Structure formats: structure tokens, C-alpha cells
Amino acid sequence: MKSVQFCFLFCCWRAICCRSCELTNITITVEKEECSFCISINTTWCAGYCYTRDLVYKDPARPNIQKACTFKELVYETVKVPGCARHADSLYTYPVATECHCGKCDRDSTDCTVRGLGPSYCSFSDIRE
């Protein structure tokens, strides 16, 4: 009985104290080819840990889906990138996460790689806040 109580208390402690998948503030760098520099924007995205496991014995009949902390709902915001050529479209639309969950990474809308370019990558040498 004590081991059941301990397991229950441990799970409660872990749920409260350990960071799970949640919204977090990040800064991303935005650039457009027609403009001569990048700007940094503050937004929200999902970060944290999701329970997952990798089976030792792989079963081809049962796919092994690793869960990742990803967005459940998004809204889009638009900023004007300064310094663009007169004929160029200076508006940049970016996603803002409003709700997160642990789920399969959607490769159509998310960079699911282990090592992407990162949110602060800029092709130009000039970055403005």
C-alpha cells in the first residue's frame, strides 16, 4: 500500500514541479529577400517535455510515434519589415502559438529536425531589434 501511495505522490510532484509542454516567450529573427536586414520579434511558442519512449524491439506492425511539444492552436500576426525596396511587399506574417500539447510533430507546418537553423538565424549581417 505504501508503494502505491508513494507512486501517486511522486506522479503528483512530477506533474506540478517539472516543466511540461507549455507556452513560452521566444524571440525570432525575421528577414525578407527584398530587404537589406533582419528584425527581431517577440512571440510565443511551445516548449517543454513530453513523456515518450523508444522501444528496444521495433515492431513494424506498430509504428513508434515520438511525441513532441507542439502547438495545438495558432494565430497569425503581421509586421512591417523596414528598409524594403519601394515595389517590394514589406509585410511578414508569422505564427503565434496560443495553446500547446504533446503530439506528433507535423512536418507540413513545423521544423521537426533535431538541428534546424534556429530562431535567430539571419542571412544578412544587419539585425535590428
UniProtKB/Swiss-Prot annotation:
Q: Where in the cell is it found?
A: Secreted
The task this protein performs is described as:
Together with the alpha chain CGA constitutes follitropin, the follicle-stimulating hormone, and provides its biological specificity to the hormone heterodimer. Binds FSHR, a G protein-coupled receptor, on target cells to activate downstream signaling pathways. Follitropin is involved in follicle development and spermatogenesis in reproductive organs.
Q: Which InterPro entries match?
A: Cystine-knot_cytokine, Glyco_hormone_CN, Gonadotropin_bsu, Gonadotropin_bsu_CS
Which species is listed as the source?
A: Capra hircus (Goat)
**PANTHER family in UniProt:** FOLLITROPIN SUBUNIT BETA, GLYCOPROTEIN HORMONE BETA CHAIN
Can you tell me which family this protein belongs to?
A: Belongs to the glycoprotein hormones subunit beta family.
Signal sequence bounds:
1-18
Main location per the UniProt record:
secreted
Q: Which residues are glycosylated?
A: N25, N42
Gene Ontology terms, cellular component aspect? cytoplasm; extracellular space; follicle-stimulating hormone complex
Q: Which domain of life is it from?
A: Eukaryota
The alphabetical list of record keywords is: Disulfide bond, Glycoprotein, Hormone, Secreted, Signal
Protein name as it appears in the record: Follitropin subunit beta
What is known about its subunit structure?
A: Heterodimer. The active follitropin is a heterodimer composed of an alpha chain/CGA shared with other hormones and a unique beta chain/FSHB shown here.
Give all cystine bridges in this chain: C21-C69, C35-C84, C38-C122, C46-C100, C50-C102, C105-C112
- Provide a Gene Ontology MF annotation, just one: follicle-stimulating hormone activity
On whether Glycoprotein is a keyword of this UniProt record, the answer is: yes
Q: Which Gene3D superfamilies match?
A: Cystine-knot cytokines (2.10.90.10)
Among the Pfam families in the record, one is: Cys_knot
Gene Ontology BP annotations: follicle-stimulating hormone signaling pathway; G protein-coupled receptor signaling pathway; regulation of signaling receptor activity
